[in-house]
């Protein structure tokens, strides 16, 4: 590890083989916490390359628990988190809309890091069991077309890295990695990041991880979702090619909404917001969910444009199908 840390201190990139070897040693308990701290900090100061991020994701995914399922078209829409926007649980709410629209949603998430309520927190408040075993989770997915995979349980190897992350207390390559190490072989993905400078490189990593189609999105003011309070930027992976795009609310036929009016609260409060959206109660929360679900339909290829995706999201919510998906998950993942 000393040689690797020294190399990072000299701002030199690691090869894929070097990164793979280091991560294998870390996740099998052969590296000290202080060395992991130095390693994560060194990568952050140097800047993480596509090769380093891909190698990390591949090793971590290889150590994840496997979910038995015959479904081969799964999608996820989680973000990196850590944007300090204190918004409600946007992607979690949107996941039920996407599932209601016929997409097989394997929602991967964790407890809160920088907000008051992460996806695991809000779903737990809604009665979802975070601790089912892998076989049971596979059955839930087969029966309902939606499942929540609690990252802490899916990635036992994280226990070797978490103390170092907590002692650092700042975003590292691990924050960028969470959405990339889904236990299932995802076909499509909507991934949010608070770093617009990493849109294209993250899309490259998704391509390396085998995604057929994906959108990596960064909202205004570093929101790790699409937002209605300014310009949203995104990278589209389609047909093996990556392209960069952006839009204002007016470009997609939506009204501008300030960030302040989509603030969330604790898990119980965010659960109430989620329910209100799925019950089609008009609010800034509903509009923000419609936008992100619409982008999700576009990322999946279910719609040919973001505008078409938004229209589909409104239809799915108004029909009650999205709310029905929540009730199904509450019934089967309990």
Curated annotation (Swiss-Prot):
GO terms for biological process: L-tryptophan biosynthetic process. One of its GO terms (molecular function) is magnesium ion binding. It comes from the Bacteria. Anthranilate 2 binds at residue 165. InterPro entries: Anthranilate_Pribosyl_Tfrase (IPR005940), Glycosyl_Trfase_fam3 (IPR000312), Glycosyl_Trfase_fam3_N_dom (IPR017459), Glycosyl_Trfase_fam3_N_dom_sf (IPR036320), Nuc_phospho_transferase (IPR035902). Belongs to the anthranilate phosphoribosyltransferase family. Catalyzes the transfer of the phosphoribosyl group of 5-phosphorylribose-1-pyrophosphate (PRPP) to anthranilate to yield N-(5'-phosphoribosyl)-anthranilate (PRA). This is Anthranilate phosphoribosyltransferase. It comes from Streptococcus sanguinis (strain SK36). The lineage of its organism: Bacteria, Bacillati, Bacillota, Bacilli, Lactobacillales. The gene is trpD.
């Amino acid at each position: 590890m000393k040689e690797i840390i020294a190399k990072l201190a000299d701002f030199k990139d690691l090869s894929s083989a070097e990164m793979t070897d280091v991560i294998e040693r870390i996740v099998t308990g052969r590296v000290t916490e202080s060395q992991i701290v130095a390693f994560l900090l060194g990568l952050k100061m140097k800047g993480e390359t596509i090769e380093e991020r891909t190698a990390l994701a591949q090793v971590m995914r290889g150590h994840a628990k496997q979910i038995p399922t015959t479904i081969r078209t799964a999608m996820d829409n989680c973000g990196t988190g850590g944007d300090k926007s204190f918004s409600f649980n946007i992607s979690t709410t949107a996941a039920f809309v996407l599932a209601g629209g016929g997409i097989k949603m394997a929602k991967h998430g964790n407890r809160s890091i920088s907000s008051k309520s992460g996806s695991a927190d809000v779903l737990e408040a809604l009665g979802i069991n975070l601790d089912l075993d892998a076989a049971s989770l596979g059955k839930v997915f087969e029966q309902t077309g939606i499942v929540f995979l609690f990252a802490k349980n899916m990635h036992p190897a994280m226990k070797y890295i978490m103390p170092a992350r907590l002692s650092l207390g700042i975003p590292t390559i691990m924050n960028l990695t969470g959405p990339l190490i889904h236990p299932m072989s995802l076909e499509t993905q909507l991934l949010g990041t608070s770093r617009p400078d990493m849109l294209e490189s993250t899309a490259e990593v998704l391509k390396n991880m085998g995604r057929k189609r994906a959108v990596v999105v960064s909202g205004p003011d570093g929101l790790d979702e699409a937002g209605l309070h300014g310009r949203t930027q995104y990278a589209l992976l389609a047909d093996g090619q990556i392209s960069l795009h952006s839009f204002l609310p007016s470009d997609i036929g939506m009204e501008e909404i300030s960030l302040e009016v989509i603030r969330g609260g604790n898990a119980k409060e965010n659960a109430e917001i989620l329910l209100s959206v799925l019950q089609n109660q008009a609010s800034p929360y509903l509009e923000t969910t419609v936008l992100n679900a619409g982008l999700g339909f576009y990322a999946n290829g279910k719609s040919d444009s973001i505008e078409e995706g938004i229209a589909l999201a409104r239809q799915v919510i108004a029909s009650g199908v999205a709310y029905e998906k929540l009730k199904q998950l509450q019934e089967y993942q309990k």
